[in-house]
Amino acid sequence: MSTLVIVRHGQSEGNARGEFTGTSDVPLTQEGWSESRRAGSLLANLGISFDIAFSSALLRTVDTCRAILNETNGDLLEPIRRTELNERDYGQLTGINKNVARERWGQDVVQVWRRSYSTPPPGGESIRDISARVLPFLISEVFPPLLRGKSVLVVAHGNTIRSLKQGIERLTIQDTLAIESPTAAPTVYRIASDLSIIEKTNVLVGTVC
């Protein structure tokens, strides 16, 4: 049996401002740091440490990953940064407050851009585009160590986590779109040798934003 833990980054400054943060490389807030350390402490209390850890290339996931690893592994492991895990490119929505975007383009239009599978915001990515880069990463980089019985940590973003869970849990598109990931809230999977899920546990730490 192996262990896979997937965590969204702690609260970022973009989250705190209510923005479509996307590919903007914003730091964690103090609350985000606290959430991340708390997530690591909860995982350590479950007896979990990691053999390999991945983050996106964006600072908010790198710092969240380091804060978690400091609790579970000390300073013995450094996250591997992968651009495949980067947050969705929101195109023209990037950096805009969500309420301002709804006023500018209309709530229904913005909701389609956010939650349809194949319609991207202007100049940005759809969730289908994200799955096209995340699922190959999952197969080539995450599944092999799990098959060797290793413990793997992945710290990513709300939209890339949708695609990760789509692949791990074999979800339908509808179920994939329904996923909401609170900040710094680990999902712990116990994985069998055939990559089926033995047990799944959600550990609530942060908030959905």
UniProtKB/Swiss-Prot annotation:
Keyword Isomerase: yes
Superkingdom per UniProt: Bacteria
Residues annotated as catalytic: 9, 87
Pathway involvement of the protein, from the record: Carbohydrate degradation; glycolysis; pyruvate from D-glyceraldehyde 3-phosphate: step 3/5
GO MF assignments: phosphoglycerate mutase activity
Keyword field: Gluconeogenesis, Glycolysis, Isomerase, Plasmid
E.C. no: 5.4.2.11
Tagged with keyword Nucleus: no
Pfam families: His_Phos_1
Subunit details: Homodimer.
NCBIfam families found in the cross-reference section: pgm_1
Name recorded for this polypeptide: 2,3-bisphosphoglycerate-dependent phosphoglycerate mutase
Species whose genome carries this gene: Rhizobium etli (strain ATCC 51251 / DSM 11541 / JCM 21823 / NBRC 15573 / CFN 42)
